[in-house]
């Protein structure tokens, strides 16, 4: 099927590419069908594009890019919602909030997105204990502390 998007224009999406979030995402409970879009120029970032809302797309990344010891404590209920037997069957991503300056880009570690890509199911899992932030700096203090220049690649905002 062809879908019209505000970010990518018209794109072809196969039914077997659609990931269903039965409960939607926090703040977007009505939007339940998404497709993951890769953009090699924006790696390691990925896009989560709504199939039904052409203006709704999120940037996401694997949490271990920023936090090596990121841990989830999933219950059997979470696994059941994703039709998974164990966490190894799942892919984990976190939402990214872009900024004009790379040093200010943040990720939401408190509300990761869990995917069972084989079953095409997704779930936003909210970590209740306050262990993680919704505004964790993606690069931590690496860019500030080492007086490194910001990466020369364009931000996702600039690529549009």
Where are the regions that the model predicts?
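Long, compositionally biased stretches
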Residues: 2-67, 87-93, 97-160
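Short active-site loop/helix that positions an aromatic residue
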Residues: 76-86
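Extended catalytic/binding region for NAD+/ADP-ribose chemistry, centered on the ART fold
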Residues: 69-74
């Amino acid at each position: 099927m062809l879908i019209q998007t505000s970010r990518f224009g018209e794109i072809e999406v196969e039914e077997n590419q659609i990931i269903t979030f039965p409960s939607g995402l926090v703040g977007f409970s009505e939007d339940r069908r998404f497709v993951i879009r890769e953009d090699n120029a924006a790696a390691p970032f990925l896009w989560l594009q709504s199939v039904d809302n052409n203006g709704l797309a999120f940037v996401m990344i694997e949490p271990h890019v920023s936090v090596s010891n990121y841990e989830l404590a999933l219950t059997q209920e979470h696994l059941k919602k994703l039709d998974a037997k164990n966490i190894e069957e799942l892919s984990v991503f976190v939402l990214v909030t872009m900024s004009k300056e790379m040093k200010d880009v943040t990720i939401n570690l408190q509300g990761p997105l869990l995917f069972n890509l084989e079953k095409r199911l997704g779930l936003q899992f909210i970590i209740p204990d306050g262990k993680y932030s919704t505004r964790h700096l993606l690069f931590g203090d690496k860019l500030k502390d080492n007086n490194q220049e910001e990466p020369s690649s364009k931000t996702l905002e600039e690529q549009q």
